Every structure is written in C-alpha cells, then in structure tokens.
C-alpha cells in the first residue's frame, strides 16, 4: 500500500478500523467460548496522547501512517470508549495458568491486557491487536491492571528492534501515554502499548485446561491452534503430537537466535512462551553488554534461573511442561482402549519429540555462530572455535555486540588490523591466541576479506536496544519529549547498517549504565 493517504483519509479510517475490530472472524480465539476468556471493557485512561507509533506496523495492518495524528487514535488505543466503537463490541482477557520461576503458579491470565479484535494484514494473515495496560481484569490478582510508561516504551522499541534483527516476535503498533499516576516502587505514569501478533496463545493456556482436568477444552484449544496456525499438523498421524513437535522446534530455533545476538528475555515462565515460537512479553529483558555467560538481566531473578546461559535449558524445560499438558490428547488416534497403555505410549512419543530440542537447537546455534564468524565452509572444529571466543569474551567481559561486529575487520594475513576488536579485551594475549586460531581457520575459506566482512555485517548488528539507550528515551518521554523514542526506533530499524550520524548509539555503554536495573515491576 502507499503511504500517500491524507489526514482526512485517516480520519475516515478510524471508524472503519473500530468496526473491523468489533467483528470477530470465523475461527478467531474469541469465538472459542466463555471458558477461554472474559469479555469486559477497558478502564478509561485520562487524557491519552501518542508517545510512539510504528508506521511499518500500520502498513502491515493496512492503515495509513497519518492515522496516528487523529485525535481519536489515542482514545481508541488507550481503550477508551469512542463514538466509533461498535455498540456490540467487547474486548476480552484470556485465562491461562503456568509455571513461574519453575514453580506451579496456578491460574494466571491476562491481568492487564485486553485483545480488542483482529485485522487482516497486507500479507493476508489475521492479526490480533492487544492493549497492554488497559486496566484490571478478573485475572489481575493483586495488580492494578496498568502498565507504566517506562516498560511500555521498552516493549514498543524492543518488539520492533527484534523484528528488524530477523527474530520472530510480537510487534507493536503504538504506545499511548497518560499523566494518570500509578504506584510501583515510586509514583509513575500510565501507558498502554498495542501489541500485534497472529496469536497470543501461550504454553500456559494448555497448562490451564490440563490442570483443571478439562480434556474437552484442551482439545478445542489445540484444534484451534492447529487449524489456524499449524494446518500441516492436521495431516500427521497424530496431530497433537505433531503440534508438540512443531512448537518445540520453533522454540529451539527462537532461543538459538536469542543466544546469537546476546538477548536475554528475563522471565521465561511458561505463561510467557508463545505456542507460535515468537518472542512475547517484553519485561525485564536486556541485550548483553560486557559479556558474562551468567548474565542476569532481571533484578528479580535472584537465583539466576533465566540467566543468558540458562535460556536453552529453560526453553527445553518449558517444552516439557507443554508436553505434559498435551498428554491427554496424544495418541487418541491410535485406538488404544486401555487408558494406561495409551498414556504410557503418549509419554514415550512425547519424550521422543522432546529429545529433538537439543538436536535442533545445537545445529541452529552453530549455523548462526558460523555466519557470525564469516565461515562459509563447515568444519567440525567450528563449534570449538566459537566457544573459545565466548570463553575469551567472558574472561575479559568484552562487549558482545561490538566484538562480533568488529571481527569483520580482522584480516586473513594482517594482524595489525585486529586492533579495533582487540581493544575490547582486557586479556590481549588471550585474544591474540584466539585470533591466530581464527586466522588459520579463515585461510581455509575462499572468500576474500572484503566479501567476508560484508557477509558478517549482514548478521552481526551494530545497533541493539541497550538498556541505557532505552533509559535516555524514557527520561525524555517523561518530560513530554518523544523525539528520542522516534529517533531510537528509526535507528533500530536498520541494525546492520552503518549509520555515521548515529555512531554514538553503537558505542560502549557509559559508566552510569552499570547502575541500571530492570525487574518484573512494570
């Protein structure tokens, strides 16, 4: 679509958009029934205003970018009632359960999020739009149902940054702010971020109906996911086992991509794991700066359960939880009358699927690391070479992003060109030893230095959403200056490009960044 529509066209689009969202499509999650969700209006947000907006996501949703300039836009995406909203439309909060920090937490659910409807994208797919921070729901527990400005800006920026890194993720259309106060560790202001995804179904949705002994509803949910998102599973001998396998493999691929860019999710509870294998629920996340394999980005994670090095193991464990939830459905097609025999067969089949996680994750990460090192040919020693680099980085706390980006400057034949990356290491001798191994490996490659460097720069980002960059944007936004949110969003849309005018955004973090902490309080 063209971005040439006028503001008047955008004004005409608002009521059409609201009407579209109010008409659920056949097969939409909301049509599953009351056991899956509660329908309720959002809590009004006082005097809302636009903080951030993604024209790219608007384009995906077949909306003109000028729509954000319309007064009714902020009202609509704050969840406030508007004259354009259909009288019979009602957002919903879904119910799910889950394991949090490895402990069964029981019923959870959308405690501060409401899905307001679906819209067909320009790619032909159906996308759900969800307002995070839209007020209390029956699943809020002790929370107030609100999100604060800082966490909403972080989610908005990281959703789009991850997309442009090529990592599967929910998207973000807009952040709507308000001066309405909310109490966290201190008084903050409210905000609502509009998340966009084909589905917000989590592992925890399946755990909920399993734990409540409702195999009928569990099957209804699984059928919904298969028919809408994994139609190939319907053709398998056991569709539900195929669903487990598809979700497991996608999760393995996703976490391999996280590891390759130094991304830490921070709170990999089973209710924060997407059945589609996309990154969801950006809370206390972080990109590793000074590399530490044991890096913990979430201040609330006192045990280090979700540390960088633990993410693959935790993702695998979460898939076990999903498998347990799906056990009542696995093997139904086999016609085994004896329940115990069927259950035993289901466990064996599920275990065989779960064993594929490391088989998928390992090679996926090796391929990513080989590309990051600029290696076209496969050698058995490549994994050892990559691991040795990470060990050397860990020992020197070398910056993760800059190390991989600057590796492109290394020459096959000229060690003097090592200086930009070498300077990132405290132990220069250790780096030199590794660089010699690397140069020996490069001698087996056919590409010249320039071609290899170009390929490496296409997979090693120069710009990532470092915590201090987000913090600067947040501080300015609190003063009603949203220009840094927009500037940072624009930079992160081109993470692999040289942007000479924005070199400061690719620099090492300032000293004050070391004192920044992010937690589950948002």
Curated annotation (Swiss-Prot):
InterPro entries attached to this UniProt entry: SelO (IPR003846)
Active site residues according to the UniProt entry: 271
Residues the record lists as binding ATP: 109, 111-112, 132, 144-145, 195, 202, 281
Keyword tags: ATP-binding, Magnesium, Manganese, Metal-binding, Nucleotide-binding, Nucleotidyltransferase, Transferase
Highest rank taxon of the organism: Bacteria
Catalyzed chemical reaction(s): L-seryl-[protein] + ATP = 3-O-(5'-adenylyl)-L-seryl-[protein] + diphosphate; L-threonyl-[protein] + ATP = 3-O-(5'-adenylyl)-L-threonyl-[protein] + diphosphate; L-tyrosyl-[protein] + ATP = O-(5'-adenylyl)-L-tyrosyl-[protein] + diphosphate; L-histidyl-[protein] + UTP = N(tele)-(5'-uridylyl)-L-histidyl-[protein] + diphosphate
One family name in Pfam for this protein: SelO
Keyword Manganese appears in the UniProt entry: yes
Similarity remark: Belongs to the SELO family.
Protein name: Protein nucleotidyltransferase YdiU
Organism of derivation: Burkholderia lata (strain ATCC 17760 / DSM 23089 / LMG 22485 / NCIMB 9086 / R18194 / 383)
